[in-house]
Amino acid sequence: MEVDNVKPSSSVPQRNWEKENNVQNVDSIFEYNNKQQVEIRNAKPWDKDPHYFKQIKISAIALLKMTMHAKRGGNLEIMGLLQGRIDANSFIILDVFALPVEGTETRVNAQAQAYEYMTVYSEMCDTEGRKEKVVGWYHSHPGYGCWLSGIDVSTQTLNQKFQEPWVAIVIDPLRTMSAGKVDIGAFRTYPEGYRPPDDVPSEYQSIPLAKIEDFGVHCKRYYSLDVSFFKSQLDAHILTSLWNSYWISTLSSSPLFSNVEFLNNQIQDINQKLSAVDKKLQLNDRSVDGHEALMKVVTDAKAVGDELETGRISHLVKQLLFARQAGGGCGCSHASAGSPMDIAVATEPEKAGPSPSAPEPAVEMADA
């Protein structure tokens, strides 16, 4: 059942976040059966069926920890490990912990320090009586979606070979901030030499033009798992404590300002894709591929427009709220030097100002 019976201590934003991400309230999922886990690991059913694992269930605490970690990383990739267990055809993720790694905008490198930290942390968990095993890893793709790159595929394949069962999670913190819902995906790679059957086309996701080639080359070497989220009444206090630090940063920031570079990159990417589609249609205006590519660009543009409008509304609401609080809380026009509506209207000329001439060089790059 979905989270409807929430404790009074939960704030309204926290309840909205849980419902937006469809967090379910389940207590029995936390029960650990050691005998069952040993039997499953000894049987190794995933060796016989490359598509054995079909879904992953993530606790709300683990989800919030990963989201906060990825958000702190900003434009740099981050990495951490997943703790949990397996149950039939599912991974159950109960907790996560971050790794001290060296990240760039396109990759993350785990050095000796990270491996040492990983070993010590796991040993401390065993000492404290925590029975959950490390069953996978997570990392971020800032601004370019949830999928596995060539390096990710190699890393996941290696881990599945020597540390099964193992799963990979990818989070996009920039798209999460823009959309308001956690952008997340979970993946497993196929064994070497295995050719997957032609499946039904998956749901379209926007991939930057610079990443499309990497995405296309490796997209048949892995598959995605259905992702769901859960929580229990026992971890409500921990979730509330985490949320108290999460909502402050969310409330004090705006995607219109914190995601300026990401939004500009999205607009430039759409411009480049339109230039490529225009060339394709000029050669053959009845090209099916050209029209399909055009519809995908339209989908991307609509998504960017929706994110901008959502960010604008959120920003105006915060201005109205805090201008009223600063004026003494009565909400009257005389309460402050400028009424909330005056402040909101004052921001419009800034938004209507001349936009940067970023599309021009993007067209030249596409023509080149």
UniProtKB/Swiss-Prot annotation:
Residue ranges of the TM segments? none
Asked if Protease is a keyword of the record, the answer is yes
Does this UniProt record's set of keywords contain Protease?
yes
* Subcellular localization: Cytoplasm; Nucleus
Q: Which GO terms describe its molecular function?
A: DEAD/H-box RNA helicase binding; deNEDDylase activity; metal ion binding; metallopeptidase activity
InterPro entries per UniProt: CSN5_C, JAMM/MPN+_dom, JAMM_MPN+_peptidase_M67A, MPN
- Report the PROSITE patterns cross-referenced here: MPN
Q: Which Pfam families match?
A: CSN5_C, JAB
Q: Which domain of life is it from?
A: Eukaryota
EC primary class: hydrolase
- Output the Gene Ontology cellular-component terms: A band; COP9 signalosome; cytoplasm; nucleus
Q: Where is this motif: JAMM motif?
A: 139-152
Sequence segments annotated as region (Disordered) = 347-368
- Where the record annotates domain MPN, the positions are 56-193
The entry assigns this protein to a family as follows: Belongs to the peptidase M67A family. CSN5 subfamily.
What does this protein do, in the record's words?
Probable protease subunit of the COP9 signalosome complex (CSN), a complex involved in various cellular and developmental processes. The CSN complex is an essential regulator of the ubiquitin (Ubl) conjugation pathway by mediating the deneddylation of the cullin subunits of the SCF-type E3 ligase complexes, leading to decrease the Ubl ligase activity of SCF. In the complex, it probably acts as the catalytic center that mediates the cleavage of Nedd8 from cullins. It however has no metalloprotease activity by itself and requires the other subunits of the CSN complex.
Name of the protein described by the UniProt record: COP9 signalosome complex subunit 5
GN (gene name): csn-5
